Amino acid sequence: MTVLPRVAIGLFGGSFDPVHEGHLRLARALRDELQLAEVRLLPAGTPPHRAPLAAAAADRLAMLRLALAGEPGLTVDERELSGRLSGYTVDTLAMIRRETGPEAALWWLVGGDQLASLDRWHRWRDLFGLAHLAVAVRPGFDAGSLPPAVAAEWQARQATDFANLPPAGRIRALSLSPVDISATAIRADLARGGDGLGHLAPAVRDYIHLHRLYRSESPA
């Protein structure tokens, strides 16, 4: 008889620069569709493959906490901001797996664009030994357009038998309406003195204006 994992945790990493309604919709979808008691949002440090972020880590963390206030089951995990991790997803997941133990079900959220480049991630195949992947795909998503190695994993790892789900190694697509919100466009609007195109929680918008964040970024 298969013993079901006693703990199931959703994990959503990102720069959150700034956190906006699109992020919150994704986190809620992960929580609700997979019936998770907890979804942890992990703000990134300085990613190893990207330019420095626009807002300081302390500000991104403060905005994320404001955005999640009153959101049941959505919490902040700030470990990647410590500077002690590599910034690679596989290393973060390995640390969380050590903390939760082998029987916890971990779900790492990725977008369809991230899935399409998964084979370029650091030690990407090791991810499946550490967690499941929950994929936020847009309507009309075509798995046939994925790189062959990723498409093979997509086909082989589909989560179907939830009564006997292992702690890691499966893939599930989340059913979402389109989320077409650009953090770049939000920052450009804020640089012009705008309100973030209406995509920011009031507390986050007020924090940005109070601390004069994103004012130096040139509008795009």
From Swiss-Prot:
It comes from Laribacter hongkongensis (strain HLHK9). GO terms for biological process: NAD biosynthetic process. The gene is nadD. InterPro entries: Cyt_trans-like, NadD/NMNAT, Rossmann-like_a/b/a_fold. Keywords: ATP-binding, NAD, Nucleotide-binding, Nucleotidyltransferase, Pyridine nucleotide biosynthesis, Transferase. GO terms for molecular function: ATP binding; nicotinate-nucleotide adenylyltransferase activity. Catalyzes the reversible adenylation of nicotinate mononucleotide (NaMN) to nicotinic acid adenine dinucleotide (NaAD). It catalyses: nicotinate beta-D-ribonucleotide + ATP + H(+) = deamido-NAD(+) + diphosphate. Gene3D superfamilies: HUPs. The keyword Metal-binding does not apply. This is Probable nicotinate-nucleotide adenylyltransferase. Pathway: Cofactor biosynthesis; NAD(+) biosynthesis; deamido-NAD(+) from nicotinate D-ribonucleotide: step 1/1. HAMAP family: NaMN_adenylyltr (MF_00244). Its EC number is 2.7.7.18. Belongs to the NadD family. PANTHER family: NICOTINATE-NUCLEOTIDE ADENYLYLTRANSFERASE-RELATED, PHOSPHOPANTETHEINE ADENYLYLTRANSFERASE.
